[in-house]
């Protein structure tokens, strides 16, 4: 099974955990300069949106590196921006992609 929501507890349902997350994030949402609905975006489309927002245009002059890491090991030292993207589909949970790595085209393009 995929990992549970970070706020999920035995005394808090998944639905309540998601609502609690929304409540906790609301102050950030109120101050955000940009909100992106990622429900239908691929990682490539997300990178394009971020590139356009950060540089003012979608030309590929701005390089965006998407790197996976575990918070328990700390944020990568060379990161300028860090986004929590646990909401994106994880290829590990797709049986056809599980044996592959991010270097494989099937994973990179999913």
Curated annotation (Swiss-Prot):
Entry annotated with the keyword Cytoplasm: no
Keyword field: ATP-binding, GTP-binding, Nucleotide-binding
Pfam family, one: RapZ-like_N
Keyword Nucleotide-binding on entry: yes
Origin superkingdom: Bacteria
GO molecular function: ATP binding; GTP binding
Secretion signal, residue range per the UniProt entry: none
TM region(s), chain numbering: none
Family: Belongs to the RapZ-like family.
Biological function: Displays ATPase and GTPase activities.
Protein name: Nucleotide-binding protein HI1146 homolog
Organism: Aggregatibacter actinomycetemcomitans
